[in-house]
């Protein structure tokens, strides 16, 4: 006879923060009868989801990668941003053997060094201070041909802030006496993560083939893009005139034998452009003449299956994460999300492990193929909900980890009306799932990984596309709900789930259960 399981669900509403300022808050502006009923009827509290509480520098906004890593680990995980920043500040980064390998290759063979990544201080994918540390290291090594390929942000920082970062970089390079900007690309092109290779090809062609519009300076390129109505994220890849090294074939593009350091530390949006450059079997688009003998260093491990790369900061191993622990106990678990957040409920939630554990099923629902999600604010939430309800009714799973992407992905567009529609779609979905869970005598911990749709305008009334620093909710939805302790953070979620499931918390999890008993 098949065992029927009482499901415990962790529902992660990506980008759903708490903010009392209703004027800037798409969640507060939306019509949400189900959320209203949930917050009225069930015990709830708030969790810290940014800064030191999630292993980031104080005042640094949280993000999906960091959030899911902390949630799944059940402990505060020292984030790559903090780890690399500390080494950059102390000078320890100068001793990094993989970074030295890239620089020594360029120096010893008369080749160029290319530094490539997101140019901002957003701290989600990269940080400009890391780029400066690499330039300083190149100077100390005696390099003379260093090219920077700037991916413009406009998402984790204001939409038209790139000039500030370009000026900061150019001033730094002038003072250092080394480095020049070779290409400029909006992250929409250079940092796709959804196999939209028509976008990636435009960035690749500029960086490798130097096939793109040519401008005298990065400032002129940016001004021209703004005149066309492009914001930083969407700047079409272009080339910038360089003082080509004497006798070099390179005008700033990647050539055979060159060294490349990709200084993004977050993996998901660094994978496609990296594969396009290093993988001989890449077939996403026609690359033209493939570059050979590239010394390519990734700041962190983007994907264990990417060939021909070194890793400057290898992954820290996390043992006894939530998924690993309940798998070892023989329990059945489901991870489900649409494409945009699938890596977060699998790879990041499992502490950087790609493979599913025994008893761990995964469902990927494709995200809609639209250029920006304000065009379809419900995204694939209804399809995800159908599959989640089926999974609950199947009684197969002890635990379901679910992510809804809407509040984050539509929040990133900066379009208030679309974000409101996204929340209203979510409200319908959460209502359906709550009903199904209660019918199955299950329970939900409803929470979020960070804020976004809760703060759509900044203090000056400008559109805000970045994550917020606001706390996130935690609600226990059950037939007999339990009170929750205050003062928690994301790393307390795994211990709380285990507590609700009646399972001992492993010693590796230093977070604490927020469930009040008695």
Indicate where each model-derived feature is located.
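Feature captures the catalytic ectodomains and active-site-proximal regions of enzymes
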Residues: 1-518
């Amino acid at each position: 006879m098949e065992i029927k399981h009482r499901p415990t669900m962790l529902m992660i509403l990506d980008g759903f923060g708490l903010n009392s300022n209703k004027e800037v808050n798409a969640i507060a502006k939306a019509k949400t009868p189900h959320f209203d009923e949930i917050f009225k009827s069930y015990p709830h509290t708030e969790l810290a989801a940014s800064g030191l509480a999630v292993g980031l520098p104080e005042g640094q906004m949280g993000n999906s990668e960091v959030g899911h890593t902390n949630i799944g680990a059940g402990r505060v995980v020292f984030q790559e941003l903090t780890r690399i920043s500390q080494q950059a500040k102390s000078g320890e980064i100068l001793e990094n053997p993989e970074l030295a390998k890239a620089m020594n290759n360029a120096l010893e063979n008369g080749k160029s060094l290319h530094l490539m990544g997101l140019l901002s201080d957003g701290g989600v994918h990269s940080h400009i201070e890391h780029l400066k540390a690499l330039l300083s290291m190149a100077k100390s090594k005696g390099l003379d041909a260093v090219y920077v390929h700037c991916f413009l942000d406009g998402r984790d920082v204001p939409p038209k802030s790139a000039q500030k970062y370009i000026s900061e970089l150019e001033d730094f390079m002038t003072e250092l006496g080394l480095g020049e900007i070779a290409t400029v690309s909006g992250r929409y092109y250079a940092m796709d993560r959804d196999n939209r290779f028509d976008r990636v090809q435009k960035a690749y062609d500029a960086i490798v083939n130097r096939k793109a519009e040519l401008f005298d300076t990065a400032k002129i390129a940016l001004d021209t893009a703004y005149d066309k109505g492009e914001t930083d994220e969407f700047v079409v890849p272009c080339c910038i005139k360089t003082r080509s090294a004497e006798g070099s074939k390179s005008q700033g593009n990647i050539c055979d034998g060159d060294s490349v350091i990709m200084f993004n530390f977050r993996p998901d949006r660094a994978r496609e452009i990296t594969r396009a450059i290093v993988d001989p079997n890449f077939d996403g688009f026609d690359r033209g003449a493939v570059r050979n003998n590239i010394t390519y260093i990734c700041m962190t491990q983007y994907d264990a299956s990417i060939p021909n790369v070194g890793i400057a900061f290898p992954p820290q191993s996390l043992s006894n994460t939530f998924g690993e622990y309940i798998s070892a106990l023989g329990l059945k678990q489901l991870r489900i999300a649409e494409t945009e957040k699938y890596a977060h409920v699998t790879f990041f939630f499992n502490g950087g492990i790609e493979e599913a554990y025994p008893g761990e099923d995964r469902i990927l629902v494709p995200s809609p193929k639209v250029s920006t999600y304000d065009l379809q604010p419900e995204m694939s939430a209804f399809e995800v909900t159908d599959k989640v309800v089926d999974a609950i009714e199947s009684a197969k799973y002890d635990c379901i980890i679910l992510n809804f992407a809407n509040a984050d992905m539509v929040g990133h567009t900066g379009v208030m009306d679309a974000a409101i529609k996204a929340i209203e779609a979510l409200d319908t979905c959460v209502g359906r799932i709550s009903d199904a869970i209660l019918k199955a005598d299950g329970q939900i911990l409803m929470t979020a990984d960070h804020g976004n749709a809760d703060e759509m305008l900044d203090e000056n009334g400008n559109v805000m596309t970045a994550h917020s620093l606001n706390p996130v909710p935690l609600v226990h939805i059950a037939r007999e709900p339990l009170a929750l302790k205050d003062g928690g953070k994301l790393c307390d979620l795994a211990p709380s789930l285990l507590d609700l499931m009646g399972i001992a918390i492993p010693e590796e999890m230093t977070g604490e259960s927020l469930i009040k008993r008695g």
